[in-house]
């Protein structure tokens, strides 16, 4: 029965831990970048008043048709 060669296990495990650390760090950097709240920009509304904005208008809905049973 052949003997199991374990000489590369240390290198494999070390590289796996290093890769997982790099992935974890990149995810943490992305999460901190996203959580920064965006700064509000001041929105300037136009001050022109249109003629129909000052008048009150009533909107009439059409009569509903009688229900047939």
From Swiss-Prot:
Topology of the protein relative to the lipid bilayer: Single-pass membrane protein
UniProt keyword annotations, A-Z: Acetylation, ATP synthesis, CF(0), Hydrogen ion transport, Ion transport, Membrane, Mitochondrion, Transmembrane, Transmembrane helix, Transport
Pfam family, one: ATP-synt_8
Highest rank taxon of the organism: Eukaryota
Main location: mitochondrion
Protein's cellular compartments: Mitochondrion membrane
Keyword Ion transport attached: yes
UniProt similarity note: Belongs to the ATPase protein 8 family.
Function: Subunit 8, of the mitochondrial membrane ATP synthase complex (F(1)F(0) ATP synthase or Complex V) that produces ATP from ADP in the presence of a proton gradient across the membrane which is generated by electron transport complexes of the respiratory chain. ATP synthase complex consist of a soluble F(1) head domain - the catalytic core - and a membrane F(1) domain - the membrane proton channel. These two domains are linked by a central stalk rotating inside the F(1) region and a stationary peripheral stalk.
Protein known as: ATP synthase F(0) complex subunit 8
Annotated source species: Osphranter robustus (Wallaroo)
Species lineage: Eukaryota, Metazoa, Chordata, Craniata, Vertebrata
């Amino acid at each position: 029965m052949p003997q199991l060669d374990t000489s590369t296990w240390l290198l494999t495990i070390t590289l796996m831990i290093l890769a997982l650390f790099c992935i974890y760090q990149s995810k943490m950097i992305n999460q901190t970048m996203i959580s920064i709240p965006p700064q509000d920009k001041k929105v300037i509304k136009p001050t022109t008043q249109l003629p129909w904005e000052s008048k009150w208008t009533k909107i009439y809905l059409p009569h509903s048709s009688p229900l047939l049973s």
